[in-house]
A protein has these predicted regions:
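Conserved phosphate/pyrophosphate-binding and hydrolysis machinery centered on Walker-type P-loop NTPases
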Residues: 2-3, 28-32, 78
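Short, Lys/Arg-enriched anionic-surface-contact patches
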Residues: 8-36, 59
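Short, amphipathic alpha-helical "recognition" segments used to contact nucleic acids or chromatin
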Residues: 31-47
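Central "turn" residue of the DNA-binding helix-turn-helix
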Residues: 46, 57-58
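Short alpha-helical "recognition helix" segments of helix-turn-helix
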Residues: 51-56
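Intrinsically disordered, low-complexity basic tails/linkers immediately adjacent to helix-turn-helix/homeobox/MYB/SANT
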Residues: 59, 70-103
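Helix-turn-helix DNA-binding helix
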Residues: 60-64
Length: 103
């Protein structure tokens, strides 16, 4: 997954959640949950912890590792989060396919 793919994934999530969270240092659950979902989807596509941390302007890959573990645990408990994950993956795949067709 390239940096442009990460940017596309981020734009899908901004549209899905109707808010930005990339540069936010806000630590409320609402924002951290969105960042953790981004991390989980990016890891689903094999993006490295360091690449995700750099994209999100985080200082350490350890934050990304923690977010991954937390979100995977939440998705096991809350089916609504698993549905959000699947919706985001589907929309990302659609936009990526449409983008490739347009080229």
């Amino acid at each position: 997954m390239t940096n442009s793919d990460l940017q596309l994934l981020y734009s899908v999530m901004v549209d899905y959640y109707q808010c930005t969270f990339r540069l936010s240092v806000n630590r409320t659950r609402d924002i951290t949950e969105k960042r953790a979902m981004f991390v989980a989807v990016a890891r689903h596509y094999g993006v490295t912890y360091c690449a995700i941390a750099q994209f999100l302007c985080r200082k350490s890959h350890a934050t990304v590792i923690h977010a991954t573990k937390v979100m995977l645990g939440y998705m096991d408990v809350y089916p609504a989060l698993k549905k959000q994950f699947n919706d985001i993956v589907d929309e990302f795949e659609f936009r990526k396919a449409v983008g490739l067709l347009a080229q």
